Amino acid sequence: MEAKRPEQTRVVVGMSGGVDSSVTALLLKEQGYDVIGIFMKNWDDTDENGVCTATEDYQDVVQVCNQLGIAYYAVNFEKEYWDKVFTYFLEEYKAGRTPNPDVMCNKEIKFKAFLNHALTLGADYVATGHYAQVKNVDGQYQLIRGKDPNKDQTYFLNALSQQQLSRVMFPLGHLEKKEVRAIAERAGLATAKKKDSTGICFIGKRDFKEFLSSYLPAQPGEMQTLDGEVKGTHDGLMYYTLGQRQGLGIGGSGEPWFVIGKNLEKNILYVGQGFHHPGLYSEGLRAIKVNWILRRESDEPFECTAKFRYRQPDQKVTVYPQSDGAVEVLFAEPQRAITPGQAVVFYDGDVCLGGGTIDHVLKKKEDRESA
């Protein structure tokens, strides 16, 4: 297919009211594209004491779009967000895991519901302020790390498909954050000095425990060591994540205590003393709901690197594809506090191969289900 010239190419930009998406729209406009800005409203904050900044954020989008001279709309994706992201978030916590809503939001909202809406506006592409790059190599789309190692967001984009990537532009992928700020300031954008948002959008500044308890009933239970010694009571397994140190309330002298495991059936929270407690370490993991961005030609084991949390340095691993579509991953070095529910994301150099959801850890390499 012959590539269209920029002025004949419509790009719909997902605008959050932040500096990254503002500069994304600016760069595309400067390159001559036909740009439309869309503000996604994903969460109903009317009953949440006005903690969410949606109204303020939309005003910033309006200001920036007026500065750039581009059309803008607000689109409501609250139902899709509730059904696809928030329900998943609660189900995972109920199952004792610690989910990553950003991965699901990118897969189901930003690059599905939003992309589909953009196509109805005649979009050729959608663009966002993510720090990542997409490269077309012989008709196959590769997801490549952003230039700024501190901001690279391929970890959160690991669930995207070829079809989604074929319609995506990431104009900030080759820039560092400080360059993006400088571009915004030079252009006098209304959002140039706005702070980056952090945390989970639907929780805002509220206390996480309080927020979760308003949706899921808490079941307090015993806090025990692996030997069965009771060290206190927990407020509900869903409030704790592996490796957590804060909020355990275990007194006494010596090294601090950490969460090292959960028993859902017996409602027991396992704790261990010391940062390097053996219960915190594992030699492998099993991941489910695996997405390969580039189709794998074989089910043979292969070596690559992986991240088990955002901003973690790459770790060497061997991946063993399973017949059910899951993978077992063995680590070159034991890993600390691997958390079920989080994403494991695979890399070959700077190319993101895909990822999956951590189902459980393998304490010993011999725990592998396949020979």
Curated annotation (Swiss-Prot):
One of its GO terms (biological process) is tRNA wobble position uridine thiolation. Its EC number is 2.8.1.13. Keywords: ATP-binding, Cytoplasm, Disulfide bond, Nucleotide-binding, RNA-binding, Transferase, tRNA processing, tRNA-binding. Residues 151-153, 309-310 are annotated as: Interaction with tRNA. The record marks H130, Q342 as: Interaction with tRNA. Its main location: cytoplasm. HAMAP family: tRNA_thiouridyl_MnmA (MF_00144). Belongs to the MnmA/TRMU family. Catalyzes the 2-thiolation of uridine at the wobble position (U34) of tRNA, leading to the formation of s(2)U34. This is tRNA-specific 2-thiouridylase MnmA. It comes from Halalkalibacterium halodurans (strain ATCC BAA-125 / DSM 18197 / FERM 7344 / JCM 9153 / C-125). The gene is mnmA.
